């Protein structure tokens, strides 16, 4: 099989939510492709497509959850090929979540999975997360970075509020902040004083490595 065919098979298995098919595709791809490529261009590509179909009303939440489970199983199957994952806390500790008032979960979950597979210790605290919970969790796990996702214009201010609370608590100097989500932009990141903006999951991994190196 060509590289493209392997990647298509990986993505297709995630889209159809077939865990067995995902594991079989991962097994097949292991000897041919780099683990990060299997995740980013195969599994995550499939999950991104699921997200698009969900947003368009073509798929429903149970399908999304099953696809996410299938993708997670695929990532787990690659753990033994990712030596840096065993020293994840050395790469950096990241708290990741979707801000209060926002129930979107897919993009944030993909980012968490990919950060984890890149070797970071990730604490995904879910969606619709109150501002103070981000800061409390960061203190609890001694986080190096907080990832803030917002998928609606109305919830964007929550990203700014987390940064303000970090300042009030005297933690801002020690905790980097990365923002993302459809309405977020580099200009918004600059305005609220975030350390970086990531347009997608691959960029989130690259920027986290850059900031926490």
Curated annotation (Swiss-Prot):
Domain of life according to the entry: Archaea
What keywords appear on the UniProt entry?
Answer: Cobalt, Metal-binding, Methanogenesis, Repeat
The pathway this protein participates in, as annotated, is: One-carbon metabolism; methanogenesis from dimethylamine
Note the InterPro entries from the entry. Answer: Cbl-bd_cap, Cobalamin-bd, Cobalamin-bd_sf, Corrinoid_p, Dimeth_corrin_MtbC, Met_Synthase/Corrinoid, Meth_synthase_dom
User: Sorted alphabetically, which SMART domains does this protein's record hold?
Assistant: B12-binding_2
Under the GO molecular function aspect, what terms does this record hold? cobalamin binding; cobalt ion binding; methyltransferase activity
**Gene3D superfamilies given in the database record:** Cobalamin-binding domain, Methionine synthase domain
Positions of methylcob(III)alamin binding: 104
An example of a Pfam family matching this protein is B12-binding
Domain B12-binding N-terminal: where? 1-90
- Report what the protein is called: Dimethylamine corrinoid protein 1
Source organism per entry reads Methanosarcina acetivorans (strain ATCC 35395 / DSM 2834 / JCM 12185 / C2A)
The primary gene name is mtbC1
């Amino acid at each position: 099989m060509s590289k493209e065919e392997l990647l298509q098979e990986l993505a297709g298995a995630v889209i159809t939510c077939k865990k067995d098919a995902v594991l079989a595709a991962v097994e097949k791809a292991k000897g041919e492709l780099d683990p990060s490529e299997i995740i980013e261009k195969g599994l995550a590509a499939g999950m991104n497509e699921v997200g698009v179909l969900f947003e368009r009303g073509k798929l429903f939440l149970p399908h999304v959850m099953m696809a996410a489970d299938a993708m997670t199983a695929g990532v787990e199957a690659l753990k033994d090929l990712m030596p840096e994952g065993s020293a994840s806390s050395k790469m950096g500790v990241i708290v990741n979540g979707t801000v209060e008032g926002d129930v979107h979960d897919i993009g944030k979950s993909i980012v968490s999975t990919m950060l984890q597979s890149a070797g970071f210790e990730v604490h995904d605290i879910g969606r619709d997360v109150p501002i103070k919970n981000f800061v409390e969790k960061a203190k609890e796990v001694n986080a190096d970075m907080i990832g803030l996702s917002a998928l609606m214009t109305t919830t964007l201010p929550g990203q700014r509020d987390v940064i303000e609370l970090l300042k009030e608590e005297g933690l801002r100097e020690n905790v980097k902040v990365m923002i993302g989500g459809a309405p977020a932009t580099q200009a918004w990141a600059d305005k609220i004083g975030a350390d970086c903006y990531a347009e997608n999951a691959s960029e989130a991994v690259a920027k986290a490595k850059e900031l926490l190196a």
